[in-house]
Amino acid sequence: CPCFSIFWLHLGLMGESSNTPARSQSSVSYMSEVRNVIIIGSGPAGYTAGLYAGRAMLNPLMFAGYMSGGQLMLTSDIENFPGYPEGIGGPEMMMQLREQAERFGLEVEDRNVDEVDLSERPFKVTVEGETFLTHSIIVCTGAESLWLDAPGEAEQKGRGISTCATCDGAFFRNEHVLVIGGGDSACEEATFLTRFASKVTLIHRRDVFKASTIMYERAANNPKIEIRTFRQIKEWLSDDKGLTGAVLENTQDGSTETIEATGAFIAIGHTPITNFLGGQVETDENGYIVHKEHTMTSVPGVFAAGDVVDTRYKQAITAAGMGCSAAIDVEKWLEENVH
């Protein structure tokens, strides 16, 4: 995730939450043309896959979703993507990636995929009552961060509340920031933020952390980190300039207190966006798609790239690289199995 990539709308994707059941289609119209490849999702993984597939003359079709460009469309500054020494805005980068891919033949539709049928080839991709046929699919739908949904949170996404310290920590130099969570991610984010922030307060609703011992001790022993247990966010506070703090609630007795902070990082987990696949592709215990051979999934002809697969890096540059790999894998697979 790049700078201020804090809205896990969907790194690729669909405007629907992963918890939204896929709609069954009682009446669909079939497109007679069988596409070489359909890319589901956009973002850096999807657009890069589209660029490479287009250059390979595969005539790729992308369903980018209503939030075309994914989370980066709500990213103010990207400073860690090579080639932009002065940084670049997220929407601008996504526009450039899209235009570049379209120049080489990517066809983009800003519509959501409802469901897919992978039981036989050609595969069926259903979009708002239309079913498209394709020899192969690249899934680039990403993963969405879990949010607290506390009062005042929606207004401060992008103005101080983030889900990626690696991306956004540098914006809070010499400031006080909060980290909410109790796992490895929360402890790692808190420790990372001490590089920039003057103080980091780690807030957890229990006194037992799910984090590994080494990650917890690293945070607990850092002089710039204060750990507050049995606390949860009741409400976010802000003014016209952005986040100013939060109201903390004691999970034991219900008492409240106000804490001042200009930044906050929510680290309570992610969920990959794979519901539309209907369980037809193998995933791990957390729902992330599993690669079986290079970027191919458990279903031959179905490939995946970006945060829908990535459980470790979650960066725009790694998503783009995986999108490139997926397109090359698709080209080779089509040569061997279809053309």
Where are these regions (language model features)?
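A Rossmann-like FAD-binding core segment of flavoenzymes
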Residues: 101-127, 131-134, 195-292, 332-339
